[in-house]
């Protein structure tokens, strides 16, 4: 897929860059694999705001039931079409298996309509095939990687992303993330070969506020223009944040505060994102 640029006929088209989706399926999604999706507008079941300034409005969407488990084992399937999914940044593919069942999978780059894909152990190392980490050679790009066997893919699911197998350590595979972190994952976990589609997603320029509203993104109000009752930065005469470091509405530091608190999985991190070796063994 290529990028689309626009002539500056209006202020909103000046500088706008979008992804050209001319090669994707133009019809409706597969009816048996979609369900309604209600917008919660950033509220929970009690009506309390859980996502400030970021949710509300936007175009109505149907949720595509993407199979992250790749549970159809040892049966070849054919890619029938590649589709746009409004709920995620990468594209999805509709796969029909020999018994007539259909599944939506994440679509990797270089996959084409008519290609064959398979799930299971000891399959061919080919883009779109899914297999345990123990069957994948070192250095291969993979996506949709499980963290626990049978739990479904959790890592590398957004547009243009992938991770790499950098080595083996007993019953674990060493996975190098795009952030530079190296992590141990059980070799029985499933992963799919290839780099995910739509790598140009990172190059788009929205161009106008209206397109952000179509995506469900509302304007963000700065804390410095609020009253003291609404935000720690509020109040004062003129534009001042009160002389304190930037914080969230609840007072948590907004600049570089470490928030990770899952010590039980520290033992699986071989190298942190900042390239220092983990001292906790």
From Swiss-Prot:
Top-level taxon in the UniProt lineage: Bacteria
Example GO BP: cytoplasmic translation
Family matches, as InterPro entries: NA-bd_OB-fold (IPR012340), Rib_uL2_dom2 (IPR014722), Ribosomal_uL2 (IPR002171), Ribosomal_uL2_bac/org-type (IPR005880), Ribosomal_uL2_C (IPR022669), Ribosomal_uL2_CS (IPR022671), Ribosomal_uL2_dom3 (IPR014726), Ribosomal_uL2_RNA-bd_dom (IPR022666)
GO cellular component: large ribosomal subunit
Coiled-coil residue windows: none
Region of interest (Disordered), residue spans: 215-281
SMART domains (alphabetical): Ribosomal_L2, Ribosomal_L2_C
Record key words, sorted: Ribonucleoprotein, Ribosomal protein, RNA-binding, rRNA-binding
Skewed-composition ranges (Basic and acidic residues): 258-269
A single GO molecular function term of this UniProt record: rRNA binding
Stated family: Belongs to the universal ribosomal protein uL2 family.
Subunit structure: Part of the 50S ribosomal subunit. Forms a bridge to the 30S subunit in the 70S ribosome.
PANTHER family: LARGE RIBOSOMAL SUBUNIT PROTEIN UL2M, RIBOSOMAL PROTEIN L2
NCBIfam families for the chain: rplB_bact (TIGR01171)
Name of the featured protein: Large ribosomal subunit protein uL2
Highest classification ranks of the organism: Bacteria, Pseudomonadati, Pseudomonadota, Alphaproteobacteria, Candidatus Pelagibacterales
């Amino acid at each position: 897929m290529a990028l689309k640029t626009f002539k500056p006929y209006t202020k909103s088209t000046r500088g706008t860059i979008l992804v050209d989706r001319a090669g994707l399926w133009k019809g409706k999604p597969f009816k048996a694999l979609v369900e309604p999706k209600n917008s919660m507008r950033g509220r929970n079941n009690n009506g309390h705001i859980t996502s400030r300034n970021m949710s509300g409005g936007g175009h109505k969407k149907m949720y595509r039931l993407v199979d992250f488990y790749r549970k159809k084992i040892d049966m070849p399937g054919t890619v029938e079409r590649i589709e746009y999914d409004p709920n995620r940044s990468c594209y999805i593919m509709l796969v029909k298996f020999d018994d007539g069942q259909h599944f939506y999978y994440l679509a990797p780059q270089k996959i084409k309509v008519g290609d064959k894909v398979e799930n299971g152990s000891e399959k061919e190392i080919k883009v779109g095939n899914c297999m345990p980490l123990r069957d994948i050679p070192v250095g291969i790009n993979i996506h949709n990687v499980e963290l626990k066997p049978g739990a479904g893919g959790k890592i590398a699911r957004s547009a243009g992303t992938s991770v790499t197998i950098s080595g083996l350590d007993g019953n674990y595979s060493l996975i190098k993330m795009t952030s530079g972190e190296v992590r141990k994952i059980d070799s029985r976990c499933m992963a799919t070969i290839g780099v995910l589609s739509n790598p140009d997603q990172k190059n788009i320029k929205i161009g106008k506020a209206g397109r952000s509203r179509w995506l469900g993104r509302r304007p963000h109000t700065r804390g410095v223009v609020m009253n003291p009752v609404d935000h720690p930065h509020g109040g004062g005469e003129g534009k001042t944040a009160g002389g304190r470091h930037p914080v969230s509405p609840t007072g948590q530091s907004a600049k570089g505060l470490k928030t990770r608190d899952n010590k039980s999985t520290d033992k699986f991190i071989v190298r942190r994102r900042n390239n220092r070796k983990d001292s906790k063994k």
